[in-house]
Amino acid sequence: MGTQKRLLMIDDDPDFVEVVAKVLVDAGYEVDAKYNPDEGFNALKTGDYDLLLLDVLMGRGAEGIMIARKIGDDPVLRETPILIITGMREQIAFLFPGQPVHPSFVPNDELIEKPVEPDLLLEKVSALLEASAKRKAETESN
């Protein structure tokens, strides 16, 4: 895989984080976990992460949505791919790349539903990291 990719996971369920992090670490990724949305967002701002895995429902409600929107508004952080991991796909309109922007959509690059299938998780993480690397290479060559 070359250099080890750093992933940040923001989810308030330690048991879920432990299972998902083990799958990712066993696949060769470095995983940092934050269980509080504010700590997670601060870690993302100060760390050098290649991908964010983000839960929607945390703490006082749909705080993951607020984090995704903050990331979308930040000129540096918006380049970080976001993989939403949630059990509430039907209740929220997610915005995927290439779709028209609507104010109620949540910006993200991909979504996976809980419970997470390990092979699907690894497939989506790999695809997002490859797409991000390709975008960075294109940006740097211009």
Q: Language-model features: where?
A:
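Non-catalytic signal-transmission and effector/linker regions of two-component phosphorelay proteins
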Residues: M1-R6, F105, E113, E117-N142
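Conserved acidic segment of CheY-like receiver
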Residues: Q4-D15, V20-L24
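Acidic di-acidic motifs
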Residues: D11-D12, D55, K114
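Short hydrophobic/Thr-rich beta-strand motif most characteristic of the beta2 strand and flanking loop
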Residues: G28-N36, A43
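His-Asp phosphorelay/catalytic-motif detector in bacterial-type signaling
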Residues: D48-D50, P75-P81
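Alpha4 helix (beta4-alpha4-beta5 surface) of REC/receiver domains from two-component response regulators
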Residues: A62-M66, R89-E113, D119, E123
